[in-house]
Swiss-Prot record:
Chief location category: cytoplasm
UniProt subunit comment: Component of the bag6/bat3 complex.
One Pfam family in the UniProt entry: Bag6_BAGS
Any GO CC annotation of this UniProt entry: extracellular region
CDD domains: Ubl_BAG6
Superkingdom as given in the UniProt entry: Eukaryota
Organism ancestry: Eukaryota, Metazoa, Chordata, Craniata, Vertebrata
Biased composition (Gly residues): 85-94
GO MF annotations, alphabetized: misfolded protein binding; polyubiquitin modification-dependent protein binding; proteasome binding; ribosome binding
UniProt biased composition (Low complexity): 95-110, 223-233, 478-495, 566-614, 699-708
Protein name: Large proline-rich protein BAG6
Biological source species: Danio rerio (Zebrafish)
SMART domains: UBQ (SM00213)
Length: 1160
C-alpha cells in the first residue's frame, strides 16, 4: 500500500492543540516520536500515542496502524520503569521541566530510582465513576491525564486507565507512584523559600510604591496571626525555586539526593544578608513600639498608617526569618563519616510545606492547592518530647519543598508529657501525608456552563484569618484550665527523643499553607481529600478543639468527611477516605498537593499504608450539573464510616455520609465536656454520630476536662459564620452571609419560583411551610441545626407562630380541640399521597401502612403544632428541634418495620417522593439528591436509636390481623387480653388520632430512656424537610408510560383497592362445614371485646368526635368498671341473640351453652 509513501498524521495533545506532521509511512512509532518531540516538548520516553483506544507500540510502523489522515492523541507518561538513575534524572530536569513551565515542587531526584508498582512506594489512590454518556472513555482518560500533567512532578508519575462498568458508568483509575525525596534538602528548600519571602517583605519596606491598602492585611494572610511558611509574593514562583537542588546525572546512589554542607553555608550566608537588610527597620520598629503606648498622631493618618505598616511587615519578616532558623537548626553534618559528607536531620519532621504563591493580581485564578498535603493540628498543655526517627522508608514521606516548624524542637507528632505552667500551642500545618488527586473535567458542550469558581485567593486568606482568630481565642481561653490535667497519658504511646524546648509563655497559633503548582488548569472544581485523625489514649480534652479547627480548615477546602478513630493500636481503614490511629496526639487532614509520600508519620511506632479514594470532579456541562456538584461538595458527596478499634476507652464516633462535609471535624468539638444544648432529663449519649448512630462505645472520657474545654456556642457560630460567609462569597454570593437557602438554590438553579409559596408542585400548607423555612434559614443556620444548636429555630419563632395561627388554625384559638381538629383535617388530605408513596413496595402482612402513617403523622404534628402555638419561653427552639429529630427517627423506624425491615424499599419510597416533587428541577440535581439520600439513609437506619419495640404502639393492623391478635390475647383470660390492648398490640384498622394517643400516654413515662438527646439527633434534621416533602408532588414513574387520560382512572382504582376492607372472620356455621385441617388453621378469630374499638367504630360510623380531650376519653374507656360493664353487656346481647334467633341450633354448637347459658 503506502508502505514507502508519505502520510499525514495529526497529533492532538492534551492542551487541545493539534499539530499535523508529514512523515514516511514506514517509520516506526519510535521514529515518529523522535520526530515530534521538539514540537510537542515531550521527550520520547514520556510520549504515549493513542489511536482508537490503543497505545501505539514503538516497534510497529505507522502504516500498520493506518493513521494516514487520522488524529492521534498524545499524552505524557512517566519514564519507563527500567530507566537508570542518571538518565531518568536528566530527562526530568530537562524536557519535563520545560513542558511544565517550571514547577515549584519539581525535584530532580524524583525519578532517580525505578519504581516497583507492587512495592511500598506504590499507592492506589482509588476510583470514581462517571456516567457513560458524558463523553468517550478515552476522552475522559485523556482529560484526567491532562489535569495530572499540570500539577508538577507527581502528575507525570501516574497511570490513568478507564473501563466501562456493568452499571453503565465509566470507571477511572488513577495510580500514583511515590518518589524519593531527601528530607535535609527539603529543609534547605523551605529555608530558601522563607528567605525569598522575607526579602520580598524587606523590599516592600524599602520601597515607597506599595499600595497603602495592603498595609493592614498583606495578600497572603492577616497580620493578626502567626503563619509559618505563608506567601507574600503576588507573582508565581520562579522555575528556579529549588536553586540548591543539584542535578542527579552524577549520582551513583538510588536513594535520596542529600545536600552537601556547602549548600547549608550558602543558605546561612543568605540569612546573614537578610538580617543586615532588616536591621534598620528593626531600629525603626523599636522606636515605634517605644512610643506606641501613649503616641498621639494628631489625626496624622498617613504617619499612623505608615507606622502600622512597618510593624506588620516587620512582624511577618521576623516570623519568616525565625522559621527559617528553625528549619535549619536540625541540619547536621557528621564529620566522622567518610567523605563526601552530606547533611542529615537529627529530628525528622513529618510536616512540611512551602509558601503559596498567590495570584493576588489575578483574582479570578483559584489557588491551586497541593495534592497530598495534610493539615495537622497539635495541642500541647505541657512540655513535649520528639518522636523517634522513622523507619528507613519513612524518609520518603515528605515529597515537597519543606515546612516551617512551629516550635524549635517538637515539630513531630508529639506525645504529651508532664509539666506545669506551660502554655497551649495550637499548630495547623500542611503535611504530605496521603496521596490525593483532584479531578478537572473539561466537557465540550453548546450550553454556557454555570461558573462555579474554585478557591480564589481571598477565600483561602479569609479562611485562615477566621480560623487563626478563633484558634487564638480558644487557646487563650482554655490554657488556664488546661494546665496539668492530662497527667500520665504517655503510657504505651510515649516516644523517646531529644529533651523538649520550653515554649513561650503564652498561647500561640501557627498556620502554614501548601505550595503552589503553577500549571493546574483553571478553574478547579471540587477537590477530594482524606482526613486522618489520630489521638492518644485516652485523648486529652484539648484534642476536641484541635479536631474542630483542623477538621474545619480541611473540610472547607476539600469536601469529604472524616474518619475519626481513637484506639490504642496502629491501624488503617480505607473506604473513600483514610483513617489511621497511632500513639501520637495530633489530627491531620489531607488537602491537595502535587508531591506524594508514604502514609507513615513521625511518631508512629508501626508502619502502615493508607489509601484514598477522594477524587473530586468539576463538570462544566450545565447549570444543573454544576449545582449538583456544588451541593455535593457542600454536603459531603463521598461515603465512609470510621469506627473505633477495640480496647479504646474514649468515645467511638461513627462517621457517616451525607453531612455537610466541612462540619464533620466540629463534631468532637461540640461534644467536648457537656452537651451544648442538652435536652431536659436527658443524659449525654455514650456516642454520637452525624447523622446519628446507635451507641457504639463506652462513655466518653472527657470528664477530667471539666468545663475548661466547653466552649460557648457563640464561638462555634462565629467560626461557621466566618467560613461560610467566605464560601458563599467564593460561589458568587453577595457580601455577608444573609443569603437564604431559597436564594442560594434559586441563584444556582437559575429559577425564580422554586420556593415561592403556593407555586410549583408543592401541596398547600406543607409547601408554604417549606418555603418559609428555606427563606428564613441560611446555610449557617442549617449547620447549626445539624449540630443540635436550636438558635435558628428560636430566631424564627415569631414567623412560625404567625404562620401556624394563620394557615393551620385559620385564626382560631390554640385550644386542644382546635389543634387536634386542624391536624386531623391536614393529615387526612395526605392520605392519597401516602397511598401513592407505598403503592410500589411490599408491606408487612397484616399491617395497614396507610392508616399507620396517618395516625403517626397526626400525633407528631399535633405535638409540634401545640408546641409552636403555645410555647413562649426560651425552650422553644430546643424542644422543637427535639420533636423534629425524634419524629424523624420514629418515622424511619416505623416505616422500616412496616416494610418488613427492607431498607431498599424505604429508600425507594423516599426517592420516589423526591422525584415526584422535583418534576421541574434539573434531572441531574434530582439524581444527585436521590443518590445522596440513599447513602445517608442506609447509615441512619443502621444506627437509628429508635427500636422496633418503641414504635409498636404506632402500628395499626388490618381488620383480620387485629381480630386474630385480639383472639390470641383472649384465649387465656380477659385480663390478659385487656393487657395486650393496653400495650397497643392491636389497634383498629383505621384508628383515629385520639385513639392512637392512648398508647402515647401509656408510654410517655418509659420513652425517655429510648429518646435520643439533642447530641444524638444532630444531622437528622437535614432529612426532616425531605420527610415532610413526602407529602407533596404529583409525578409517578408509571404515569409517563400510559396515556394521560388514563392516569386519573388508574390512580383512582389504586386508591379504591387500598381502601377495600379485608374479609370479615368466617361464621361458626361456615367453619363447622370445613375440613378439620382447614378449620384448625382458621381458628383463633374470637369476638372483638375492645371497648375502645367499639367506640371508635361507632364514632366513625356516626361521623362524630369527642367533645373532651382525647386523653380524657381514653382514660374513661379504660377504667375497670366500664370495661367490666362492657363485657357483661356484650355477653348479655349474645345471650339474647341466641335465645331469639330461630336459626340457632344448639346441636351444631354444643359448647355454646358453657359460655352463654342462662345461668352462666
Amino acid at each position: 500500500m503506502e508502505e514507502s509513501g508519505v502520510i499525514e498524521v495529526t497529533v492532538k495533545t492534551l492542551d487541545s492543540q493539534s499539530r499535523t506532521f508529514t512523515v514516511r509511512g514506514e517509520w516506526t512509532v519510535k521514529q515518529f516520536k523522535e520526530h515530534i518531540a521538539a514540537s510537542v516538548e515531550i521527550s520520547v520516553d514520556k510520549q504515549r500515542l493513542i489511536y482508537q483506544g490503543k497505545v501505539l507500540q514503538d516497534e510497529r510502523t505507522l502504516t500498520e496502524y493506518n493513521v494516514d489522515g487520522k488524529v492521534i492523541h498524545l499524552v505524557e507518561r512517566p519514564p519507563p520503569q527500567s530507566s537508570q538513575p542518571g538518565g531518568g534524572g536528566g530527562g526530568v530536569s530537562g524536557s519535563s521541566g520545560a513542558a511544565d513551565g517550571g514547577s515549584s515542587s519539581s525535584q530532580s531526584s524524583a525519578y532517580t530510582t525505578s519504581h516497583d508498582r507492587n512495592a511500598n512506594n506504590y499507592v492506589m489512590l482509588g476510583t470514581f465513576n462517571l456516567p457513560v454518556n458524558i463523553m468517550d472513555p478515552q476522552q475522559i482518560q485523556m482529560s484526567v491525564q491532562q489535569m495530572l500533567a499540570g500539577v508538577g512532578e507527581m502528575g507525570r508519575n501516574v497511570r490513568v486507565s478507564t473501563s466501562t462498568g456493568s452499571s453503565g458508568s465509566v470507571d477511572v483509575h488513577i495510580n500514583v507512584d511515590q518518589s524519593v525525596q531527601s528530607e535535609p534538602r527539603m529543609r534547605l528548600h523551605l529555608a530558601e523559600n522563607l528567605l525569598r519571602e522575607t526579602q520580598a517583605l524587606i523590599h516592600r519596606l524599602e520601597g515607597q510604591s506599595s499600595e497603602p491598602s495592603q498595609q493592614e492585611t498583606p495578600p497572603p494572610q492577616p497580620s493578626s496571626s502567626s503563619f509559618s511558611a505563608h506567601p507574600m509574593d503576588s507573582s508565581p514562583p520562579p522555575p528556579s525555586v529549588s536553586s540548591s537542588a543539584s542535578q542527579t546525572e552524577g549520582e551513583t546512589q538510588s536513594g535520596p539526593n542529600h545536600p552537601s554542607p556547602l549548600e547549608l553555608v550558602e543558605v546561612l550566608s543568605e540569612v546573614r544578608r537578610v538580617e543586615e537588610r532588616l536591621r534598620p527597620f528593626m531600629e525603626r520598629t523599636h522606636s515605634i513600639l517605644g512610643a506606641a503606648t501613649s503616641a498621639d498622631y494628631n489625626n496624622n493618618t498617613q504617619e499612623r498608617e505608615e507606622d502600622q505598616r512597618t510593624l506588620n511587615l516587620i512582624g511577618e519578616s521576623l516570623h519568616l526569618l525565625g522559621n527559617t532558623l528553625v528549619a535549619l537548626s536540625d541540619l547536621r553534618c557528621n564529620l566522622s563519616a567518610q567523605p563526601p559528607r552530606h547533611l542529615h536531620v537529627v529530628r525528622p519532621m513529618s510536616h512540611y510545606t512551602s509558601p503559596v504563591m498567590m495570584q493576588s493580581g489575578l483574582p479570578h485564578i483559584p489557588i491551586p492547592m497541593n495534592l497530598g498535603s495534610t493539615v495537622t493540628m497539635t495541642s500541647n498543655s505541657r512540655q513535649t518530647s520528639d518522636g523517634q526517627p522513622q523507619p528507613p522508608h519513612s524518609s520518603n514521606q515528605s515529597d515537597q519543598q519543606g515546612q516551617a516548624p512551629p516550635t524549635p524542637a517538637n515539630e513531630s507528632n508529639q506525645q504529651t508529657g508532664h509539666g506545669q505552667g506551660t502554655p497551649r500551642v495550637i499548630r495547623i500545618t500542611h503535611q504530605t501525608m496521603e496521596p490525593v488527586v483532584m479531578m478537572q473535567m473539561n466537557l465540550d458542550g453548546t450550553t454556557v456552563p454555570l461558573h462555579v469558581p474554585g478557591l480564589p485567593p481571598e477565600f483561602m486568606q479569609a479562611i485562615m484569618h477566621q480560623i487563626s482568630q478563633q484558634a487564638v481565642t480558644m487557646a487563650t481561653a482554655a490554657s488556664a484550665g488546661h494546665q496539668g490535667q492530662q497527667q500520665g497519658t504517655a503510657g504505651a504511646g510515649a516516644q523517646n527523643g531529644e529533651s523538649p524546648v520550653p515554649p513561650p509563655p503564652q498561647a500561640r497559633v501557627v498556620i502554614t499553607r501548601p505550595t503552589l503548582s503553577p500549571r493546574v488548569p483553571q478553574p478547579m472544581g471540587t477537590r477530594g481529600t482524606t482526613i486522618n485523625l489520630r489521638a492518644a489514649v485516652p485523648p486529652p480534652s484539648g484534642q476536641q478543639t484541635n479536631q474542630m479547627v483542623s477538621g474545619l480548615v480541611g473540610q472547607l477546602l476539600l469536601p469529604l468527611h472524616t474518619g475519626d478513630q481513637t484506639s490504642t493500636t496502629s491501624s488503617s481503614h480505607s473506604f473513600s477516605f483514610s483513617t489511621s490511629s497511632s500513639t501520637s496526639s495530633s489530627s491531620s487532614f489531607s488537602s491537595a498537593s502535587p508531591p506524594l509520600s508514604s502514609a507513615n508519620t513521625s511518631g508512629q511506632t508501626s508502619t502502615h499504608t493508607t489509601s484514598t479514594a477522594s477524587v473530586g470532579q468539576a463538570q462544566e456541562s450545565g447549570p444543573g450539573d454544576n449545582l449538583a456538584q456544588l451541593l455535593g461538595s457542600l454536603l459531603g458527596g463521598a461515603a465512609g464510616a470510621g469506627g473505633g478499634v477495640s480496647g479504646a476507652t474514649p468515645s467511638i464516633t461513627v462517621t457517616v455520609p451525607g453531612v455537610p462535609a466541612f462540619i464533620q471535624g466540629l463534631s468532637e468539638f461540640i461534644q467536648s465536656g457537656q452537651p451544648v444544648f442538652p435536652s431536659p432529663n436527658q443524659q449525654p449519649p455514650p456516642s454520637q454520630a452525624t447523622p446519628p448512630s446507635a451507641p457504639s462505645g463506652p462513655a466518653p472520657t472527657t470528664a477530667p476536662s471539666g468545663g475548661a474545654e466547653t466552649l460557648s456556642p457563640e464561638l462555634f457560630t462565629g467560626i461557621v459564620q466566618g467560613v461560610l460567609s467566605t464560601m458563599m462569597g467564593s460561589l458568587g454570593a453577595g457580601q455577608g452571609n444573609t443569603e437564604s437557602i431559597a436564594q442560594f438554590i434559586q441563584r444556582l438553579s437559575q429559577t425564580s419560583n422554586l420556593f415561592t409559596p403556593g407555586a410549583g408542585d408543592a401541596v398547600g400548607f406543607f409547601g408554604d411551610l417549606l418555603s418559609l423555612v428555606c427563606q428564613s434559614f441560611s446555610m449557617v443556620d442549617m449547620v447549626l441545626l445539624l449540630h443540635g444548636n436550636p438558635q435558628p429555630l428560636s430566631r424564627i419563632q415569631p414567623q412560625l407562630t404567625a404562620f401556624f395561627t394563620e394557615h393551620y388554625l385559620q385564626g382560631r384559638e390554640p385550644t386542644d380541640a382546635n389543634i387536634a381538629s386542624a391536624s386531623e383535617d391536614l393529615i387526612n388530605e395526605l392520605e392519597e399521597y401516602i397511598a401513592e408513596s407505598f403503592s410500589t413496595v411490599t408491606v408487612r402482612e397484616g399491617v395497614d401502612i396507610i392508616q399507620t402513617n396517618m395516625s403517626f403523622l397526626r400525633q407528631q404534628f399535633t405535638r409540634m403544632a401545640t408546641h409552636i402555638l403555645r410555647c413562649t419561653d426560651n425552650t422553644f427552639g430546643q424542644r422543637l428541634l427535639y420533636l423534629c429529630t425524634q419524629g424523624l427517627f420514629e418515622c424511619l423506624a416505623l416505616n422500616l418495620y412496616c416494610l418488613r425491615g427492607e431498607q431498599r424499599a424505604l429508600t425507594t419510597v423516599i426517592n420516589h417522593r423526591i422525584r415526584r416533587m422535583s418534576a421541574e428541577v434539573n434531572p441531574s440535581l434530582v439524581n444527585w439528591l436521590t443518590s445522596m439520600m440513599s447513602m445517608r439513609l442506609h447509615v441512619i437506619l443502621e444506627h437509628n436509636p429508635v427500636t422496633e419495640d418503641q414504635i409498636q404502639h404506632y402500628v395499626i393492623y388490618t381488620q383480620s390481623e387485629s381480630a386474630r391478635r385480639t383472639e390470641a390475647g383472649s384465649q387465656s383470660s380477659q385480663q390478659s387480653q385487656n393487657m395486650n390492648v393496653e400495650e397497643g398490640l392491636s389497634p383498629a384498622p383505621a384508628t383515629t388520632a385520639e385513639e392512637a394517643l392512648r398508647s402515647t400516654g401509656d408510654t410517655d413515662g418509659d420513652e425517655a430512656p429510648g429518646r435520643p438527646s439533642a447530641e444524638e439527633t444532630r444531622g437528622a434534621v437535614a432529612m426532616a424537610t425531605t420527610e415532610r416533602e413526602e407529602s407533596t408532588g404529583e409525578a409517578e414513574p408509571w404515569a409517563a408510560t400510559v396515556p394521560p387520560e388514563w392516569v386519573p382512572i388508574i390512580r383512582r382504582d389504586m386508591l379504591t383497592q387500598r381502601k377495600m376492607k379485608a374479609q370479615p372472620p368466617l361464621s361458626d356455621a361456615y367453619m363447622h362445614g370445613m375440613p378439620a385441617k382447614r378449620r384448625k388453621t382458621a381458628q383463633g378469630e374470637g369476638p372483638h371485646l375492645s371497648l375502645t374499638e367499639a367506640v371508635s367504630r361507632a364514632a366513625r360510623t356516626a361521623g362524630v368526635r369527642p367533645v373532651t380531650a382525647p386523653d380524657s376519653l381514653q382514660g374513661e374507656l379504660e377504667t375497670p368498671e366500664l370495661q367490666e360493664a362492657y363485657a357483661q353487656q356484650v355477653k348479655s346481647d349474645i345471650k339474647k341473640r341466641l335465645s331469639d334467633d330461630p336459626d340457632y341450633n344448639h346441636q351444631r354448637f354444643p359448647n355454646t351453652h358453657r359460655v352463654f347459658s342462662e345461668d352462666a
